[in-house]
Amino acid sequence: MASVEYLIKQFLTPDKKQLDLSNQNIGDKGAIKLTQSKNLCRLKKLILPNNNISDEGITAIANSENFKQLTDLDIYGNVISDDGVKAIAESPYMSNLKKLSLYGNLVEDEGAIAIAESQIL
């Protein structure tokens, strides 16, 4: 796997509003690295399918001020469970989210209820 900073340079759109890291296998360590990049503070769309991200990685993303402008979060095909979805549903930084793609994860009723009842989303 290439370094996350390299991937950001390669796949961040010129306007810095979209990052597509589909199928890069960044895992939780890579997801956490994303939260530390100041190049992503204008990001509107974050595309992370099939990256082996679990609750740890998505919780870091959900709790990062870097992503407070996100409107679109594609995290399908990872290993995120109810706890990770709850982190998204409860994070004040996810308040602009309009689209959340979760299919192919480990989300069950508890996570779905957290999204449905969220006062933030």
Question: What residue ranges belong to the model's regions?
Answer:
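N-terminal segments that cap or nucleate solenoid repeat domains
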Residues: 1-52
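Structural register of leucine-rich repeats
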Residues: 15-19, 32, 41-44, 59, ...
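Concave beta-strand-loop units of leucine-rich repeat
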Residues: 19-26, 47-52, 63, 73-79, ...
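Generic structural signal for well-ordered alpha-helical scaffold segments
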Residues: 8-9, 35, 62, 89, ...
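Short, solvent-exposed loop/turn at the beta-strand->alpha-helix junction
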Residues: 1-4, 24-32, 51-59, 79-86, ...
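Residue-level signal for alpha-helix termini/capping positions
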Residues: 12-13, 39, 66, 93, ...
